[in-house]
């Protein structure tokens, strides 16, 4: 109470911060008459003037006022849109590395032009991140008109681009793209073997649109590039044979949380059985070198206790097929990850499909923290303000709306059963549709969307077919004639262009649109219809002229008339029904369930009431909804029965809303803790990832790594001497024979070490020096024999390839370690500290193995066919070996709503994954088709050819060493 009083008197901290931006807004407004008087050429010339000022030492912040004023004028001339004062404030928040919370329809896309232009003046690249390819392309084209008018370059990163196209896009002043594309490009760049092959040029400044979706909702689902792994089917089968011998006393099962763990008795039993089967060969089960076996045991245990045949999965055509728990449908093509699917295959004795190994991964949390400067925009961030501040050091500023919000948010209606809830929803849709009020029905999943669609069909509605060119024509005609169409649309999140079009037309009188809570973000729902979309669809082929101008005016008039109908579509007061006042028209939001996050509910509500429009929202709940079960539906069910509620009746009260919000706050706090915990563990891997990636980049940037190779060889010798000639040990205790074998195996040197140790007074330092001298002489001879230039190339490639191989194995080991480290808590040890300690030891082991394996390979390398002349002009193939190739790679990122790999279906519905020229599975068909169309004798049919692809002429050489070389010379 006192806090509310103080806020009323002094204002909130947010109000004070917004007020602090007002003087600069006034300064920008004061410049407007002067800048409006400039010609287009003079306005464009200001960009170079600003750059000259920066070069002379002017601070970027000092250019904010004139730069923002310049962008506002450019937008007025190019787009016909003028930034409001509150949009200027939003732009300042973004420039200062904050999050601008702006309500739906307040023009976030236009706001971004202000800080993007200002920061692009530095020439270091600005990245604008959107949630899908359609929005990236749309915004780059739409706002790109402003940037290009002012002399800046704009690029777009979308699926299917090759390296050359990506590099061009990243070289632009401003680059638009999706979070997935930016993240995967970073991972792939750090798997390249030449600096010239890398596409990104650094991480200077990024603005993340829908920042809450990307940095909160997707924070726990890492981007993963995976590749085929060695066949482990025998180990899956061997471990599976032990599982049927377990009894309930051997494990603790929590079906509600879907978790299972071995008891102490279970651990002892499993260890004995694994030893008897010859699987556990040495040490205890939970020793670090046995993490792979522990991983297999855990997955086999889950397969046998948590998953039931014909309930969770079925066996069909020698395959384990997952059954969706909500719909009961088979989910062809979906597989459980982390070896669980292979464990189920072993359990059912079907063919075990190969699993993929993680080649590289990163979470969005750690990717976006690479940027020196980060900012974000969204309509809903306040509920997660603490998380943005703690994890990303980003402050959330709530930007005032240009006009007051007129939407009415009604209290929830709570029903006893799901059936009663859905019956009430269909009745409400019927009533609103009869008034021609547009309705947006929000659901928590694609399956629930389909369920609502089926219920509407049973009620006599038909699904709108957007593949029919006349479908929308009929809708517009019905709106003009005040007819009820009884048609509805369902958003399909896999086709973003269609999705945006459906959302854009969801404000037409009588429109019924069913969507998941997340679908369609980024596209406004305008009451009456979307003029730009209709011009594009209906008048796209009509040439400029009086006829087109008249048609546009007719569309404007029709949309204005439709808007008036929508505004008048509200529900009138009905005292008998307990409704004392009129409810507004505008877009009617119907929520079919509460999400566990208040933010997602607010996003759904925020679709209505844009820019001062009226609107209405209401949530329909049942006691069987997930959140209501958490809240305690048994108690509430009893309360409803005592109140005498009959079937089909609902309880509506503000107290219910408050209770649900408290439940949501608890869930949000739990999820925040989980994300923080994930980040703590991921930070351990992230620190190691940064070291490895920096070392790789440093190695690629060197003309020669000979000095590094020599240091590695000397380090290996030091390790050998330390192991076989321990410090302070007597000469009789030295292991001369072991040292001799290691020198022969790794260094390729057959040395009389046993004779050396017999010499009077010889010390370990002397033996070390002799080994170094012998290895240096041997290696120098090898370099001379194979050719210095060839060996310089080979050294770099061997170091990089061995590092990559060991890093991939290290990732798998860390992943397995992370899964079992929680058990240390039972021994009163902190699992996180244990993980840090063991991860550090494993990383030290990686460094030691890197030295030894690089030394061993280079100490035995021989070039089979040495042709120095060919090497000089034909490439490394003529010298007897080929350049390293990237392994087969598959991008993976699980959608936090559906759980699907967003790239698993890319080959069937769009142009593939994030792969471009990388040979991802989703790209294979289209890539092969392109090759088949090339005529070896006609270079004009070749199209863009990758430098490392086989030359289309059929010579067998790489393109860069064949016709690509001629093209370069030309």
From Swiss-Prot:
Protein's cellular compartments: Cell inner membrane; Cytoplasm
Binding site for Zn(2+): 951, 953, 962-963
PROSITE patterns in UniProt: SECA (PS01312), SECA_MOTOR_DEAD (PS51196)
UniProt-annotated binding residues for ATP: 87, 105-109, 524
GO CC annotations on file: cell envelope Sec protein transport complex; cytosol; plasma membrane
Any Gene Ontology biological process: protein transport by the Sec complex
Enzyme Commission number(s) from the entry: 7.4.2.8
Alphabetized CDD domains for the sequence: DEXDc_SecA, SF2_C_secA
Membrane topology, record value: Peripheral membrane protein
Keyword entries, A-Z: ATP-binding, Cell inner membrane, Cell membrane, Cytoplasm, Membrane, Metal-binding, Nucleotide-binding, Protein transport, Translocase, Translocation, Transport, Zinc
Binding partners and assembly: Monomer and homodimer. Part of the essential Sec protein translocation apparatus which comprises SecA, SecYEG and auxiliary proteins SecDF-YajC and YidC.
Known role: Part of the Sec protein translocase complex. Interacts with the SecYEG preprotein conducting channel. Has a central role in coupling the hydrolysis of ATP to the transfer of proteins into and across the cell membrane, serving both as a receptor for the preprotein-SecB complex and as an ATP-driven molecular motor driving the stepwise translocation of polypeptide chains across the membrane.
Family: Belongs to the SecA family.
Official protein name in the record: Protein translocase subunit SecA
Native source species: Methylorubrum extorquens (strain CM4 / NCIMB 13688) (Methylobacterium extorquens)
Origin organism lineage: Bacteria, Pseudomonadati, Pseudomonadota, Alphaproteobacteria, Hyphomicrobiales
Gene name tied to this protein: secA
């Amino acid at each position: 109470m006192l806090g509310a009083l103080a806020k009323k008197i002094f204002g909130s901290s947010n109000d004070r911060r917004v007020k602090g931006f007002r003087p600069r807004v006034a300064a920008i407004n004061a410049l407007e008459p002067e800048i409006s008087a400039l010609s287009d050429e003079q306005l464009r010339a200001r960009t170079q003037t600003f750059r000259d000022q920066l070069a002379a030492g002017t601070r970027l912040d000092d250019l904010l006022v004139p730069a923002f004023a310049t962008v506002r004028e450019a937008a007025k001339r190019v787009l016909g849109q003028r930034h409001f004062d509150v949009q200027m404030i939003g732009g300042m928040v973004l420039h200062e590395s904050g999050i601008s919370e702006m309500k739906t329809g307040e023009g976030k896309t236009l706001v971004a032009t202000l800080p993007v232009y200002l920061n692009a003046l530095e020439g270091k690249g600005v990245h604008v991140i959107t949630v899908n390819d359609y929005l990236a392309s749309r915004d780059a084209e739409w706002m790109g008109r402003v940037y290009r008018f002012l002399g800046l370059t704009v690029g777009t990163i979308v699926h299917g681009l090759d390296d050359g196209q990506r590099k061009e896009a990243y070289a632009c002043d401003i680059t638009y793209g999706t979070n997935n594309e930016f993240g995967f490009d970073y991972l792939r760049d750090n798997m390249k073997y030449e600096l010239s092959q890398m596409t990104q040029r650094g991480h200077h400044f990024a603005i993340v649109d829908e920042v809450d979706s990307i940095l909160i909702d997707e924070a726990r689902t890492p981007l993963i590039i995976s590749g085929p792994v060695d066949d482990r089917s025998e180990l899956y089968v061997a471990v599976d044979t032990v599982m049927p011998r377990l009894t309930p006393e051997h494990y603790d099962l929590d079906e509600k949380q879907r978790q299972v763990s071995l008891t102490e008795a279970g651990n002892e039993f499993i260890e004995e059985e694994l030893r008897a089967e010859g699987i556990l060969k040495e040490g205890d089960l939970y020793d670090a070198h046995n993490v792979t076996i522990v991983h297999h045991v855990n997955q086999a245990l889950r397969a046998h206790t948590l998953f039931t045949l014909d309930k969770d999965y079925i066996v069909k055509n020698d395959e384990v097929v997952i059954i969706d728990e909500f719909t009961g449908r088979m989910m062809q093509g979906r597989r459980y990850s982390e070896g669980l699917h292979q464990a189920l295959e072993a359990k059912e004795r079907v063919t075990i499909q190969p699993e993929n190994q993680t080649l590289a991964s990163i979470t969005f949390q750690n990717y976006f923290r690479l940027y020196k400067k980060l900012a974000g925009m969204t309509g809903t961030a306040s509920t997660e303000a603490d998380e943005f501040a703690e994890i990303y050091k980003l402050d959330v500023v709530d930007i005032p709306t240009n006009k007051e919000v007129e939407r009415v948010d009604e209290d929830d209606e709570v029903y006893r059963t799901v059936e009663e809830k859905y019956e009430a929803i269909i009745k409400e849709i019927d009533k609103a549709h009869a008034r021609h009020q547009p309705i947006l029905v929000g659901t928590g999943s694609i399956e629930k969307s389909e369920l609502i669609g089926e219920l509407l069909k049973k009620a006599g509605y038909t699904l709108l077919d957007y593949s029919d060119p006349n479908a929308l024509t009929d809708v517009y005609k019905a709106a003009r004639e005040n007819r009820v169409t009884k048609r509805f649309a369902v958003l399909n999140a896999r086709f973003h262009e269609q999705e945006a079009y459906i959302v854009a037309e969801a404000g037409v009188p009588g429109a019924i649109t069913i969507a998941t809570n997340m679908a369609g973000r980024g596209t406004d729902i305008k009451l009456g219809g979307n003029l730009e979309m209709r011009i594009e669809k209906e008048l796209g082929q009509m040439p400029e002229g009086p006829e087109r101008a008249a048609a546009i005016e007719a569309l404007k008039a029709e949309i204005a008339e439709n808007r008036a109908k929508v505004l008048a579509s509200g529900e009138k007061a009905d005292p008998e029904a307990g409704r004392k006042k009129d409810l507004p028209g505008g877009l009617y939001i119907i929520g079919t369930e509460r999400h566990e996050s208040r933010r997602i509910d607010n996003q759904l509500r925020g679709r209505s009431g844009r820019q001062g429009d009226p609107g209405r929202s209401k949530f329909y709940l049942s006691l069987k909804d997930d959140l209501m079960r958490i809240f305690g539906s048994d108690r509430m069910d009893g309360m409803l029965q005592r109140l005498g509620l009959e079937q089909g009746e609902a309880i509506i009260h503000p107290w219910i809303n408050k209770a649900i919000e408290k439940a949501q706050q608890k869930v949000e706090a739990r999820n925040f803790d989980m994300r923080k915990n994930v980040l703590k563990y991921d930070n351990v891997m992230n620190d190691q990832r940064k070291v490895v990636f920096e070392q790789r980049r440093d190695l690629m940037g060197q003309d020669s790594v000979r000095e590094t190779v020599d240091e590695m060889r000397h380090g290996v010798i030091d390790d050998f001497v330390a192991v076989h000639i321990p410090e302070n040990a007597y000469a009789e205790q030295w292991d001369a024979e072991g040292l001799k074998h290691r020198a022969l195996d790794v260094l390729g040197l057959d040395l009389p070490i046993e004779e050396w140790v017999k010499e009077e007074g010889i010390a370990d330092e002397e033996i070390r020096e002799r080994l170094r001298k012998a290895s240096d002489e041997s290696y120098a001879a090898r370099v001379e024999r194979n050719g210095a230039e060839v060996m310089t190339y080979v050294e770099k490639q061997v170091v990089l390839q061995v590092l990559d191989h060991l890093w991939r194995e290290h990732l798998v080991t860390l992943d397995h370690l992370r899964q079992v480290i929680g058990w240390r808590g039972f021994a009163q040890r902190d699992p996180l500290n244990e993980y840090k300690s063991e991860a550090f030891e494993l990383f030290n082991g990686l460094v030691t193995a890197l030295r030894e394996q690089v030394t061993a390979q280079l100490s035995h390398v021989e070039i089979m066919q040495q042709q120095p002349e060919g090497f000089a002009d034909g490439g490394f193939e003529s010298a007897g070996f080929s350049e390293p190739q990237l392994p087969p790679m598959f991008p993976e990122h699980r959608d936090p709503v559906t759980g699907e790999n967003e790239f698993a279906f890319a080959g069937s519905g769009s142009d593939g994954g994030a792969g471009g020229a990388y040979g991802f599975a989703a790209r294979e068909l289209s890539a092969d088709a392109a090759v088949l169309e090339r005529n070896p004798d006609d270079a004009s049919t070749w199209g863009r050819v990758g430098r490392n692809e086989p030359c289309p002429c059929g010579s067998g050489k790489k393109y860069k060493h064949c016709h690509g070389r001629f093209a370069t010379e030309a």
